[in-house]
UniProtKB/Swiss-Prot annotation:
Family: Belongs to the BshC family.
The organism's taxonomic lineage, starting at the top: Bacteria, Bacillati, Bacillota, Bacilli, Bacillales
Listed EC numbers: 6.-.-.-
Molecular function GO terms recorded: ligase activity
Stated name of the protein: Putative cysteine ligase BshC
InterPro entries: Bacillithiol_biosynth_BshC (IPR011199), CC_BshC (IPR055399), Rossmann-like_BshC (IPR055398)
C-alpha cells in the first residue's frame, strides 16, 4: 500500500476548526495540543466514575462478542483510576455500514495508541454502537454496482418490528439471501469463500442488528484491543439511571444552554444544525414499541402531542423500574457518554464536529467540560485499475477530489473536438431563428392565416436541429467510448453518487478483493491529524 495526503477543500465549522480559527475554537473547551490533552487528564482525575460496575458490564458484553485477549485486558484496565478512553460511535449498519465506520475505528485505535505513548497513561480505544436507534432505513442497506449503475440494496426483513437496533431481531435466512445478492455483484476472487464464511460466522452468532454489527467489528479488529459498547444494552442503562434523573431535573437548563450556544454559533456566522422545540426534554421513552421524544407541558412530561403524559414522580419511578425504556437524543447522547466514560478525546466526523460546537454550554450546565473533539481520519482507496485509468487520462490523483468528475469528463471530451459542439449549435440555432422570424413576418403579410403554421414550422425545425445535436454528441461519445468508460469507473470508485467513497462503499468489497487482513494492512499505515485526506493506492 502506498499512502499520499491531499488537501480537500472543506466548508463551515470543520474548515475553520481545522484551520485554527479562534472564534470557532472558542466553542470547544480544549485545543488539540499536547498541553490540552495533559490538562484533560488532570481534569478527569478530579472526577469520579463508576469504573468497577462499568468494567463488569463491558467484560460480560465483549466476552459475549468473543473479544480477543487485548480487548479483555483493556476492559480490565478501565478499572484503574488512571486509565482513559478515546471514543467514537456509529449506528449498527448492516455489514458495518459505509467505510467511514471502519475509518472511525482506525482513528480511535491510532489516537489511543499515540496518546498513551505521549502522555504516559493508559489509554484504551472504545467504540459506542448506537443501539437505541429505531431508524432502520439508515442501517438496513448497502450500495453495489450493478449493470453499470450504483444501486442501493435494501435488506427487507420478512418480520419487521418497530424496535431499536439492539432489539430488532434479524431473520438469518433472509439476511443470508441478501448477503448472497450483494456478493453476486462482486467479482469472485481467491478470498470470496473465506469472506462469506467470515460474515456467516458472525451472522450465525447474532440475533439482532447490533449483535451482527458487534460480531463483525470484533472479528475484524480481533487483535486491536478495541472495546465495544452497546449504548442501549439493558445492563448499561441501569448504570445510567442516576444521570437520566439529573437530565430530567435539569432539562430546562439543558435547553437554555443549547439555545444560548446556538446564538453564539449564529453570531459567528454559522447555521445551527440541531433543531429542537423550546419545551424539549431531550430524552426518548419507549412506549408501545415506539421511541417517543418527551416534552414539557405545564409541568407534565408528555409525548406525541399529549397522547402520553407523566408526572415527574411517575417518570422517575419508571426509570428505576425499566431503564431500558429510556434513551438519549442528539443533545444528551454526548453528555451520557461523558458521564459513563473517562473520555480523553472524542473522535467525530464533519457533521458531528459541527453539532458538538453547539453543545459547549450544555456540557457546562451539567458541570462537565467538553472533551477534546478530534476530526476522524478520512481515507480513499485507489485500486490498480483505477490508478491506470487516471494515468491514461493524464489526471492527477487529486483531480477527482478537487473537481467534479462529470466536469473533468466534459472538459476532456471538448478537447478532443476542434470546435465546441454546444457553442456551434447555439450559434446555428440563433442564426436560423433570426432567419425564420423574418420569414414568419413575410408570411404574415401575405397570408395571416398561416401565422400559426409558421410558428409550428419554427418549432419543428428547432426540434430537428436538437436531434442532430444529440446524434452528433452520441456519435462523438461512441468514438471515445473507451476513454469515457474510464471516467465512469473513476467516478464510481472515488466519487460514487458524487459523494466521498467512504460514505457510499462498504468494507466487504475490499475484503473480497484483498483478503480478510485488508483492515490490518490499512492500520499498518501512519495517518496524520492535519486535516488532510489520505489516499491509499492498493
Amino acid at each position: 500500500m502506498e499512502i499520499k495526503e491531499i488537501s480537500v477543500p472543506q466548508q463551515g465549522v470543520v474548515a475553520d476548526y481545522m484551520n485554527g480559527k479562534k472564534e470557532i475554537q472558542s466553542c470547544f473547551d480544549y485545543m488539540l495540543t499536547e498541553d490540552a490533552f495533559k490538562q484533560r487528564v488532570q481534569d478527569l482525575r478530579e472526577r469520579e466514575f463508576f469504573r468497577q460496575d462499568l468494567v463488569a458490564h463491558l467484560l460480560e458484553y465483549n466476552t459475549k462478542l468473543q473479544a480477543g485477549e487485548a480487548t479483555i485486558q483493556n476492559v480490565k484496565a478501565l478499572g484503574d483510576e488512571d486509565t482513559y478512553v478515546v471514543i467514537a460511535g456509529q449506528q449498527a449498519g448492516l455489514l458495518t455500514g459505509p467505510l467511514y465506520t471502519i475509518h472511525k475505528i482506525i482513528s480511535v485505535l491510532q489516537l489511543a495508541k499515540e496518546k498513551e505513548e505521549s502522555l504516559g497513561v493508559k489509554v484504551v480505544p472504545v467504540f459506542w454502537i448506537a443501539g437505541e436507534d429505531h431508524d432502520m432505513d439508515e442501517i438496513n442497506h448497502t450500495f453495489v454496482t450493478k449493470n453499470k449503475k450504483i444501486k442501493k440494496t435494501i435488506f427487507h426483513d420478512r418480520n419487521p418490528k418497530k424496535a431499536s437496533a439492539s432489539e430488532s431481531e434479524l431473520s438469518l435466512e433472509d439476511c443470508r439471501k441478501w448477503i448472497e445478492e450483494i456478493f453476486k455483484t462482486y467479482p469472485e476472487t481467491n478470498f470470496t469463500k473465506d469472506v462469506l464464511q467470515f460474515i456467516d460466522d458472525s451472522l450465525g452468532e447474532s440475533n439482532t442488528y447490533v449483535d451482527f454489527f458487534g460480531h463483525l467489528i470484533m472479528k475484524m479488529f480481533i487483535n486491536s484491543g478495541l472495546i465495544l459498547v452497546d449504548s442501549h444494552h439493558p445492563e448499561l442503562r441501569k448504570l445510567e439511571v442516576p444521570f437520566f434523573k439529573q437530565i430530567i431535573s435539569k432539562y430546562k437548563e439543558v435547553q437554555e444552554g443549547l439555545h444560548n450556544q446556538q446564538e453564539v454559533i449564529k453570531e459567528l456566522g454559522y447555521k445551527p444544525i440541531i433543531e429542537t422545540k423550546s419545551n424539549a426534554v431531550h430524552i426518548f421513552m419507549e412506549i408501545d414499541n415506539e421511541r417517543v421524544l418527551l416534552e414539557d407541558n405545564q409541568g407534565k412530561f408528555v409525548g406525541k402531542d399529549g397522547t402520553y403524559s407523566f408526572s415527574y414522580e411517575e417518570l422517575i419511578e419508571e426509570m428505576e423500574r425499566s431503564p431500558e425504556r429510556f434513551s438519549n437524543n442528539v443533545v444528551t447522547r454526548p453528555l451520557m457518554q461523558e458521564y459513563v466514560f473517562p473520555t480523553l478525546a472524542f473522535i467525530g466526523g464533519p457533521g458531528e464536529l459541527a453539532y458538538w460546537s453547539e453543545l459547549q454550554q450544555v456540557f457546562h450546565t451539567i458541570g462537565f467540560r467538553m472533551p477534546p473533539v478530534v476530526p476522524r481520519i478520512t481515507i480513499t482507496y485507489i485500486e490498480r485499475d483505477i490508478a491506470t485509468d487516471l494515468h491514461d487520462l493524464q489526471l492527477q490523483e487529486s483531480d477527482p477530489f478537487l473537481n467534479n468528475v462529470d466536469k473533468l469528463r466534459e472538459n476532456w471530451l471538448s478537447n478532443q473536438i476542434e470546435e465546441p459542439i454546444d457553442e456551434r449549435f447555439v450559434e446555428a440555432k440563433k442564426e436560423i431563428i433570426d432567419i425564420h422570424k423574418s420569414l414568419q413576418q413575410f408570411v404574415k403579410k401575405i397570408d395571416p392565416g398561416l401565422s400559426s403554421f409558421a410558428g409550428k414550422n419554427e418549432f419543428k425545425i428547432n426540434e430537428q436541429i436538437e436531434l442532430l445535436e444529440r446524434m452528433l454528441k452520441r456519435n462523438v461519445e461512441k468514438k471515445h467510448e473507451v476513454e469515457l468508460n474510464k471516467f465512469r469507473r473513476i467516478q464510481f470508485a472515488i466519487r460514487p453518487l458524487g459523494a466521498p467513497q467512504e460514505r457510499v462503499w462498504n468494507v466487504c468489497y475490499y475484503l473480497n478483493q484483498f483478503g480478510l487482513d485488508f483492515v490490518d494492512r490499512v492500520m499498518e499505515n501512519s495517518f496524520s491529524w492535519n486535516g488532510k485526506h489520505h489516499v491509499i493506492k492498493l
